[in-house]
Amino acid sequence: MITREKLEEFRSSRRELAEIRAEIKKAELDGSGTRNGYTIAMYEAIAAERADELERIEIEINHLESADHRRVLRMRYIDGMGIKAIARRMHYSERQTKRILARAIEMIEDAGETDR
């Protein structure tokens, strides 16, 4: 289920995935097969888990019917934009943008509940 908390963690998880992939490269380049006590296989398993999690969130966003809901979620949680910047880009007031965001979060959380 996708929650507001998972959306808020999206950018951090994406950065973490990049760091894990960098550690895998370093372990491969130095030939040791390990890095910071983790084997390449352990890093790859963690990276696959993070990548799957991020993909699930993006799929849920893409399944929303409203283009405004999809856009506001991407701008806020994937691109990390603030409400003012989103409002300017979407040509809405900040108040309307907050309403759209709140409704989009509600819709994505509801979609996750019906998937169970």
Put a short name on every predicted segment.
Residues M1-H63, K84-A85, E106-R116:
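N-terminal interaction/assembly modules
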Residues E5, M81, R99:
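Short, well-structured alpha-helical interface segments that form or flank functional binding sites
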Residues H63-L64, H91:
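Short, conserved sequence motifs enriched in acidic/basic residues, glycine, and aromatics
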Residues L64-M81:
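Short amphipathic alpha helix immediately N-terminal
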Residues D79-R95:
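Helix-turn-helix DNA-binding module
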Residues H91-A111:
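DNA-recognition helix of helix-turn-helix
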